[in-house]
A protein has these predicted regions:
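Non-ligating segments of multi-cofactor redox enzymes
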Residues: 1-190
């Protein structure tokens, strides 16, 4: 019997992704990575952040992790959201309270509720229509809509995102059970 290890799990997940691609699934990866709330702009965040790790250490949701190369090799250890692990809690501003450099400005809960860190994107071919993303969204930015499958002569429900309401918290991406490829992913804003 072979014990499960992270390497074996990664190999198995890679094989599942290849099989899903063969069945017509589409990979969905962020076009831009998501930085924490409270920054004035991405360029100011990258310039001011020293990668000290206070926001990562104090995040109660554990959604933040140090970047490796997501923001380029000149910006190692800058905090990046990891929606595979968790999501940014709607009523939490802890990361903005502990930043010593001003890369993240303190936010009130009310300001956090409207601070946009990203936008969710749906890949309808991967969506299983379960509705978990819609039920988890704190801003009610996701609904399920019928989508016709003309080749099969039927319609099915798929997630639809209202980006005027989405703030990019990642709750939808975190909860999405579609495997081996998520049906929804959050792209960071500049």
């Amino acid at each position: 019997i072979v014990a499960s290890t992270p390497a074996l799990t990664a190999i198995a997940n890679g094989a599942k992704r290849i099989q899903a691609l063969d069945r017509g699934g589409k990979p969905l990866t962020p076009s831009r990575y998501v930085a924490p709330p409270g920054r004035h702009s991405m360029s100011a965040f990258l310039e001011k952040c020293t990668g000290c790790g206070l926001c990562v250490a104090r995040c109660p949701a554990k959604v933040l992790r140090p970047s490796s190369n997501e923001f380029g090799w000149l910006h190692p250890l800058h905090p990046v959201m990891d929606f595979d692990t968790s999501y940014c809690r709607y009523n939490c501003t802890r990361c903005t309270e502990v930043c010593p450099t001003g890369a993240l400005q303190p936010l009130t809960i009310e300001e956090k509720h409207i601070f946009i860190i990203g936008h969710a994107q749906v890949e309808p071919a991967n969506c299983i229509g379960c509705g978990l993303c819609a039920s988890r969204c704190p801003r009610k930015a996701i609904t399920l809509r019928p989508r016709d499958n003309r080749s099969a002569g039927q319609s099915r429900l798929v997630a639809n995102v209202d980006n005027s309401a989405c703030i990019g918290c990642g709750a939808c991406e975190y909860i999405c059970p579609a495997t081996p490829m998520k049906a929804i992913v959050v792209n960071g804003v500049i």
